[in-house]
Regions:
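Conserved acid/base catalytic micro-environments in cytosolic active-site loops
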Residues: 2-174
């Protein structure tokens, strides 16, 4: 997977916040995430928020996996944490993420809840909060989660990307 992650110009800061990229992936998207972050320079003036479909009954090691794939700081998102450049935030298990005024908000899943669209929920909140200071990237998965969220990001002036299945011609960002 070829990904261009280093623009030839500095990205604008909005309200002292870096450009924020939401990345949505299915539970099987570890390889795609690993490849993505191998191409991101450590000094990137970007913050990344990774939203995945996690099994609430199994402990996630995604933050540890990504730490070995990038020189950027990687950490599990905490409630109220202000997003900062050069950091990869990973959605914690048993919750879903939103964002308000550049601060991550954790919302716990109700017990027994399995069916939700965490990527759409985060992307929609990101678009409303950051407008054109946001991008959405959908990696792997066929359940449609992320489809509505990227529409909202695009409507608010942000940029959207989607992974192309192997063997298909690459698409330009919209």
């Amino acid at each position: 997977m070829d990904i261009l992650c280093s623009p030839p110009y500095p990205l604008p800061m909005k309200n002292d916040l870096p450009f924020i990229v939401g990345i949505g992936a299915s539970a099987g998207g570890i390889d795609a995430l690993s490849q993505f972050f191998k191409g991101v320079p450590a000094q990137a003036d970007i913050a990344f928020v990774v939203v995945t479909h996690l099994n609430p009954d199994r402990e996630s090691q995604l933050d540890k996996v990504l730490e070995h794939k990038t020189e950027m700081a990687v950490r599990v998102a905490t409630d109220g944490e202000r997003v900062s450049a050069g950091t990869v935030y990973v959605m914690p298990q048993g919750s879903f993420l939103s964002i308000s005024s550049g601060r991550l908000k954790l919302n716990e899943l109700s017990p027994g809840t399995r069916e939700h669209q965490p990527v759409d929920l985060f992307f929609s909140a990101l678009a409303e909060d950051q407008k054109d200071n946001a991008a959405g990237v959908v990696l792997s998965g066929g359940d449609g989660d992320g489809t509505l969220g990227v529409k909202v990001i695009k409507e608010q002036g942000g940029v959207t990307f989607a992974q192309v299945a192997d063997g298909e011609p690459p698409l330009n960002p919209e």
